[in-house]
């Protein structure tokens, strides 16, 4: 989960208007998952927001942000034995 704040105690109120049919649909889905309407709405909204953020293809950085981004990309990767083992395996299509 990108924003762990989605799991924290609520400290702000969100108000929204919906059609009866929308509320009924949301309530039905929430009931299937054994969640309250509020929990269902907040969890699915956070998931959708994370997807939008993670699917970004264009990033607008100022010079300082761009330099930090490039430094992170150029930083050496920590050794990971699991990844090394995976990369050492012969692909199934080469067997």
Swiss-Prot record:
SS bond partners: none
Entry similarity comment: Belongs to the TacA antitoxin family.
A Pfam family: TacA1
Reported effect, residue 51 to Q: Mimics acetylation, severe growth arrest in vivo when induced, increases translation inhibition by TacT1 in vitro, forms complex with TacT1 which only binds 1 DNA site in vitro, no change in tacA1 transcription in vivo
UniProt GO MF annotations: DNA binding
The protein's name in its UniProt record: Antitoxin TacA 1
Written domain comment of the UniProt record: The N-terminus is thought to bind DNA.
């Amino acid at each position: 989960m990108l924003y762990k704040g989605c799991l924290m105690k609520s400290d702000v109120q969100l108000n929204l208007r919906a059609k009866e049919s929308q509320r009924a649909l949301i309530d039905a889905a929430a009931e299937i998952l054994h969640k309250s309407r509020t929990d269902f709405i907040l969890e699915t909204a956070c998931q959708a927001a994370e997807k939008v953020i993670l699917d970004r293809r264009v990033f607008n950085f100022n010079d300082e942000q761009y330099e930090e981004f490039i430094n992170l990309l150029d930083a050496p990767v920590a050794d990971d034995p699991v990844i090394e083992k995976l990369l050492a395996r012969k692909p199934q299509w080469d067997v």
